[in-house]
C-alpha cells in the first residue's frame, strides 16, 4: 500500500521547523529517522497532510557531556550510540540498549529522539531514559520546556509532546564516581520488539548504592520506572539480599498482559530475573569489570 498524499517540508533551521509546526498544528508530523513513521504511512495507520523532515536541521545530532549534564540530540542515531566509546564506558546502559534496537538497517537510520516521541511501550529507549532519570527538552515557537522522562510518557504511543513542539534534546545527569549499567532484553528473534526488557543504571559510593535507576519495557501501557525497587537500594551495599529485594519490587511494579509472547506470570518472572542479572552486571561494571 502507498501512503496517502502529503506535502513535504525540509526546513534548514530549528526556527523554521518551529514556525512550520506552529502553522500546521495537528496536520503536521515530524519525520526523523522514519523507521517507525514510514511503515505507518505505508499502511495508512498515519495519514498526516504534511511531513516536516528535520534531518537537515543542524545541531540536533549533538552528544556532549558538559556542566554536569550529558546532552543527546534528538537526531542522534542508534548506531552512533552503539559505537560511542564514551557512552560504553560511562553510560553502558545506553550503548548496550542501542546495540539491541531492531536490526542494523534500523539502527543506521533510526534516531533516539524519534523512538522516544513514537512512545511504543515495547520500544527500547523509554526504559533506558527512565533508569537514567533523563529529561526531555521540548521546543515550540513560544519557548521551551523540560519534561522528566517519568512525566513524558502518558500511554501507548502517547506523550506530553504537543503538535507544535519539537523534541530537540535529551538531558541526563552526568555519571559521578563509580557507575555501571545494563540492558537486558528478551525477544522472540533477533531484531524483534521486546517481550520484556529491563534497564539498570547504578552509581556507587564506598561500596554502597548512591543512586539506582530501573526502567521496564513492554510490561505496561507505557515504559515503567520501578521506583520502589530503586528506593530499596539507596544507601545499601549491593549484596544478594538487596538485589533480590529490588528484583521482587521491580516484578511487582510490572503491569504485563498475557499474549502470544507469554503469560502475565512468565513476564513478571522475566522482570525479576533480568533485574537481578542487570544489577549484578551493573555492579561489576561499577567496580571496573566488563
Where are these regions (language model features)?
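C-terminal structural segment of proteins
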Residues: 1-290
Amino acid at each position: 500500500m502507498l501512503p496517502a498524499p502529503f506535502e513535504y517540508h525540509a526546513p534548514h533551521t530549528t526556527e523554521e521547523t518551529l514556525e512550520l509546526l506552529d502553522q500546521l498544528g495537528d496536520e503536521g508530523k515530524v519525520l526523523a529517522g522514519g523507521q517507525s513513521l514510514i511503515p505507518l504511512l505505508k499502511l495508512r495507520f498515519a495519514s498526516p497532510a504534511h511531513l516536516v523532515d528535520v534531518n537537515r536541521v543542524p545541531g540536533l545530532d549533538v552528544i556532549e557531556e558538559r556542566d554536569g549534564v550529558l546532552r543527546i540530540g534528538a537526531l542522534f542515531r542508534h548506531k552512533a550510540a552503539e559505537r560511542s566509546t564514551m557512552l560504553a564506558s560511562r553510560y553502558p546502559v545506553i550503548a548496550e540498549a542501542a546495540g539491541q534496537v531492531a536490526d542494523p538497517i534500523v539502527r543506521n537510520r533510526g534516531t533516539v529522539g524519534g523512538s522516544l516521541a513514537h512512545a511504543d511501550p515495547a520500544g527500547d529507549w523509554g526504559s533506558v531514559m527512565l533508569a537514567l532519570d533523563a529529561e526531555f527538552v521540548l521546543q515550540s515557537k513560544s519557548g521551551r520546556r523540560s519534561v522528566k522522562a517519568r512525566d513524558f510518557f502518558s500511554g501507548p504511543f502517547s506523550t506530553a509532546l504537543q503538535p507544535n513542539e519539537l523534541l530537540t534534546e535529551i538531558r541526563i545527569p552526568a555519571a559521578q564516581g563509580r557507575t555501571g549499567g545494563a540492558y537486558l532484553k528478551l525477544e522472540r528473534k533477533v531484531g524483534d520488539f521486546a517481550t520484556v526488557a529491563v534497564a539498570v543504571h547504578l552509581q556507587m559510593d564506598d561500596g554502597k548504592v548512591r543512586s539506582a535507576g530501573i526502567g521496564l519495557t513492554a510490561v505496561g501501557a507505557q515504559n515503567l520506572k520501578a521506583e520502589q525497587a530503586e528506593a530499596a537500594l539507596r544507601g545499601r551495599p549491593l549484596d544478594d539480599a538487596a538485589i533480590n529485594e529490588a528484583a521482587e519490587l521491580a516484578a511487582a511494579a510490572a503491569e504485563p498482559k498475557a499474549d502470544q509472547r507469554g503469560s502475565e506470570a512468565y513476564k513478571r518472572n522475566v522482570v525479576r530475573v533480568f533485574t537481578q542479572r542487570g544489577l549484578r552486571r551493573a555492579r561489576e561494571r561499577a567496580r571496573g569489570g566488563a
